[in-house]
Amino acid sequence: MNPPASALGRSALITAAALALGACGLSGSLDGEVKGEQAGGAPPEGGHGGQGGGEGGRGGGGGGGEASTVACVDECPANGGGITLGCETRFLFGMNYAWHNFAGDFGGIAAWDKRGVTAEAETHAKHLAGMRESGASVARWWMLPEIRGESVVFDENGDPAGLGATTRSDIQKALELAEQADINLMFCLFSFDNFHPSRIDGDVKTVGISPLVTDAARRAALIENVVRPIAQAVEQSPYRHRMVAWDVINEPELAMTGPSPYGDPDYDPDPEVEPVAHEQMETFLRDTIQALRADSQALITIGSASMKWSLAWTTTDIDFYTFHMNDRVNRYWPYNQSPADYGITDKPVVMSDFPTAGLATANVSKLLESWYSQGYAGAISWAYRDAGPNELASMKAFVDAKGCGVRF
């Protein structure tokens, strides 16, 4: 069973407006006028979770544009649906970058000699170009998976007071480099890693956000002084059309405890985090999404750890769902089931984290063919820096075989 090909709800209305008013190109990046106004204790190397195993559980974004006298016609829509940007609906194919310096790409970590994007532009340009050459149309890039170093400034009370000296310029340089590489970006703001307790590692303080998320005033400071300036930095870039979506947080369920109010299994948090209840995380994500809506026209999603918690974010204002897949998840929520099989029919679904080497029961080519044929809206592998030549070649072969329906 396939989900509806068109985006629903808010995204459908935006897409309808784009179809009536927008103009778009047919390959590469979208026309600037349309896409530029779219509505769319861990170690230093950080934690990549995705272990949403266990039993229980169950089972496109849209874009808008300024008025134009030219009708918007998509001449190469994805088979079975996808993510809509401007007037183009494509299977959103890409790779997790996911970082060059964990928690240091945007702002840097001076004490560890970890520099931000601007200072390492040549390295990032090479990596982005490599992803594009391997068929990726989007790179999922982590921003603040932990808050440390110079990325965020705190006041004397320990509350977020603004972005660091180079954070804004690093964001804008990332967009410029994406333009040069002809690749689009999905910035992932936070991760469950942020919920590790505050600590000192090698003279560098890492600030855990559980106390910020659960206090209304401190949460407001985080959003007003960090989230909104990040979104504004994107919108002020001449290359803002390269920003296709915000992933608000990577695998939030791994920083949650207690029951789900929507009927999913109870949460099973990472043992090293300071977990919060569903209601507390949902409030944080709702507030963050509201701020992103106010200051950015990019699409919005939440990087759910697995189909185990398929209902977790169904009442939030996101444009499409993203879920993660690995061998443990696959034991209980097999990769070869459609979104509709898991009870998800209201919004597009992208698999935004799965091994570049594939699963024990399916190589990457088989995974991609399954998701493409069963109505998923996209697939973003983990991760470019982990991929070998054969895996990159397999992903490129998938794109070449499917053609323009998987290329933005």
Language model regions located:
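Active-site mouth of glycoside hydrolases
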Residues: 75-318, 324-331, 345-347, 354, ...
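Aromatic-rich peripheral "rim/lid" segments of glycoside hydrolase catalytic domains that contact
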Residues: 362, 366-408
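Ras-like small GTPase catalytic G-domain
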Residues: 341-342
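Acidic-residue sensor for enzyme active/binding pockets
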Residues: 45, 55, 66, 247, ...
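Active-site-adjacent beta->alpha loops and helix N-cap segments on the catalytic face
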Residues: 334-336
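Ser/Thr-rich, Pro/Gly/Ala-heavy low-complexity intrinsically disordered linkers and tails
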Residues: 1-8, 13-72
